[in-house]
Amino acid sequence: MSLNRQEKAVVIEEVSAAVAKAQSIVIAEYRGLDVASVTVLRKTARESGVYLRVLKNTLARRAVAGTAFEPLSEQLTGPLIYGISEDPVSAAKVLAGFAKSNDKLVIKAGSLPNNLLNQEGVKALATMPSREELLSKLLGTMQAPIAQFVRTLNEVPTKFARGLAAVRDQKAAA
């Protein structure tokens, strides 16, 4: 189904808005994927906050023109699905994870702002922890000394109470 000029302008505007907020874009060739597989991929992407879209490559080129993702336009050939994410690793994780279980989805390239990634770069990006995971690790590291200090402070009255209970038990037994 072909789009008229107004529809194309709307699509370009929508994708340009997503690209303007994006921290990463990953493209993959989806040749041979059935509808059920694409539906599962879309559901996974939606849950991860990844904007996933099949676009004509010329429309995608226009959407990334003049942005930090412009170097990606050289890679736009063939039937591609675009994963656009505000988190630098989410799109790579979703598409690389799906590509592991479904060999018909082939990751072609990816891009961080002003940085083009090849297939291996996207797979390496997918293995990195997300921002939320890094923040939770940092928070755990920051809380550990405080929690240990609180447990140590709590141990003094606990030992005292155990000592009193032992004296009470001795006197009760005598």
From Swiss-Prot:
**Keywords, in A-Z order:** Ribonucleoprotein, Ribosomal protein, RNA-binding, rRNA-binding
Question: Molecular function terms in GO for this entry?
Answer: large ribosomal subunit rRNA binding; structural constituent of ribosome
Q: Which GO terms describe its cellular component?
A: large ribosomal subunit
Name a biological process GO annotation: translation
Q: Which Pfam families match?
A: Ribosomal_L10
What is known about what this protein does?
Forms part of the ribosomal stalk, playing a central role in the interaction of the ribosome with GTP-bound translation factors.
What does the sequence similarity comment in the record state about its family? Belongs to the universal ribosomal protein uL10 family.
Q: How does the annotation summarize its subunit structure?
A: Part of the ribosomal stalk of the 50S ribosomal subunit. The N-terminus interacts with L11 and the large rRNA to form the base of the stalk. The C-terminus forms an elongated spine to which L12 dimers bind in a sequential fashion forming a multimeric L10(L12)X complex.
Q: Which PANTHER family does its entry note? A: 39S RIBOSOMAL PROTEIN L10, MITOCHONDRIAL
Instruction: List the NCBIfam families hit by this protein, alphabetically.
Output: PRK00099.1-1 (NF000955)
> What is the protein name given in its UniProt record?
Large ribosomal subunit protein uL10
Taxon lineage: Bacteria, Pseudomonadati, Pseudomonadota, Betaproteobacteria, Burkholderiales
The record's gene field reads: rplJ
